[in-house]
Amino acid sequence: MTSPSSSFWNTASREAMKSGMFVAKVYCFLHVTTNYLGFMAYAYGPSMIPTLHPSGNMLLAERISKRYQKPSRGDIVVIRSPENPNKTPIKRVVGVEGDCISFVIDPVKSDESQTIVVPKGHVFVQGDYTHNSRDSRNFGPVPYGLIQGRVLWRVWPFQDFGPLGPTPT
């Protein structure tokens, strides 16, 4: 015969085990989803005007295509900043490996331009609003390994919910 207290502890330990397994499954699902399939990205600031709002956007980005295909001109990508690895800016791909890119170095201060060839395994990224954007004009071409994902949809603000096309609007 089991005492009421041992029955309580048996039931409590079974429930704790069930809850722990549920939490572990949810954690594994979220880990696989965000590291291999897609993730939510937050973009704010003026560098992608008019495509994105400077006051903030929630975007859905996918990670699958970066494993199977190279980025294309016009794609909006989330990158790991070459200058500060804690930041993940969102920029548009304007040049792929082998492209010859001419750009104005600092459009606010001068008309001085520079031309570079994008090296193999790199992309040239730029904000849509070039007068206020830190991008490949500042830190050079970005290696494929720093691309975190490709932006597919704007989720917030709700009035602009929908897919983001490959070219500026």
Swiss-Prot record:
GO terms, biological process: signal peptide processing
GO molecular-function terms, A-Z: serine-type endopeptidase activity
Enzyme Commission number: 3.4.21.-
Active site: 47, 91
Coiled coil residues, start to end: none
Keyword vocabulary terms for this entry: Hydrolase, Membrane, Mitochondrion, Mitochondrion inner membrane
A single Gene Ontology CC term: mitochondrial inner membrane
Subcellular locations according to the entry: Mitochondrion inner membrane
Assembly mode: Heterodimer of 2 subunits, IMP1A/B and IMP12.
Similarity comment: family membership: Belongs to the peptidase S26 family. IMP1 subfamily.
Role this protein plays: Catalyzes the removal of transit peptides required for the targeting of proteins from the mitochondrial matrix, across the inner membrane, into the inter-membrane space.
Name recorded for this polypeptide: Mitochondrial ATP-independent inner membrane protease subunit 1b
Organism encoding this protein: Arabidopsis thaliana (Mouse-ear cress)
